[in-house]
Amino acid sequence: MKQRLIQYFTQNRERIAADIVRLMSAFVAERTINVISERLADYPFLKCRGEEYRVAELVKQEFRRFGIRFTEYARRPERPNVVGTVGRDEAGTRLLLAAHMDIVPAGDGWTTDPYHVTIRDGIAYGRGVLDNKGPLAAIIVAGGILTELFGDRPMAGQLLIAALADEEVTDPDGIDYGIEYLLTERLIRPSHAIIPDIGGDMRQIDVAEKGQAVIRITAQGRQAHGSTPEQGINAIYRMASLVRELERLVLDYTPHAVLGIPTLNLGEIHGGAAPNIVPGECTIHLDIRTVPGLTRQSLEHQLQKCLVQVDGSFRMETISWSEPHQLDPDNEVVRAIQNNSLNLLGFRPEPFGMGGGTFAKTLNLAGIAAVGWGPGSENAFHVTDEWMEIRQLVDFALLICLISWDLLT
């Protein structure tokens, strides 16, 4: 049966590539931009964050075309998740393939229209072709081919093909519309998962991810007229002193064998209303990636010690927190990926740990054996002229079919 799949892809490769590109292009044309609520006004065409329903409608249309059963789950109508199912679900093994429908803003400097897929020399350019609309198109087409060739008959297990909402940012309101919503409400119950959202050109398998803390620190001063700065307290100057302390901060931690060391990035700073006003507040946001052993309590304590080194008044809040995780790389999902990749492409993807966060972490922390693995370059995420090799998307679709066959029949 696996040989039949390989033969089918060999004979129909151009048509399969065209199918993936057609679907990916339709997804990319929908500007499903996800930003935190306070930035929503920068995107007047959005009525809410994400608006993943725009892509979800296309996903449902495609599932109907392929004859794939599906269910829509939505905490909010504009932000749905669509889960298609293939297989009889009699074996207790459920493999989740999950890709997200939301994207980050395009930003500036593109040489192509970011919301229109441009193809040059076998490479597709556009916002989302890698993260994550290209892989989403590939897993849908893979599910369609399995259904076309075999129906549900040979697969005693079940393949879940999920188009998910709300991956790119965590809003300060703490409400999740994607994978955490589905797991908390027990709407899906996979035993294993593959998340195609790490890059690595299919040569790496993400089995460990750092934790993430997003910290907001506000320096409090006293507003005054710009011509009499001595009557105020300049919150930006106060924050500048703290930034120097943060640059010198050495976190107390134990290096991890796979994940290495924690990192701290000062990613945002906001302060002041006008040049002729002494600013009364200045705020920064820190992104800290943690390793096992560095607890939330310990991190917050170390940052508080840093604050007291600076003369002034500060307010610190932990906006979001997620734990690190590590999955034993000796498991059947990793073996299925490695064996099929070696047989088809001639290389054996290797397990590794990463600092970025994917749905794999959320799933693993919920007790589901999930790995990150997929097509595309890790250097193409969130960049100008985001790109994806079409060849990789087709190879990935075939590998998904072969891996699903190994795990579910």
Predicted features, each with a name:
Residues 1-15, 54, 71-76, 105, ...:
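Metal-dependent amide/peptide-bond hydrolase catalytic core
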Residues 93-95, 123, 160, 191-193, ...:
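Structural motif
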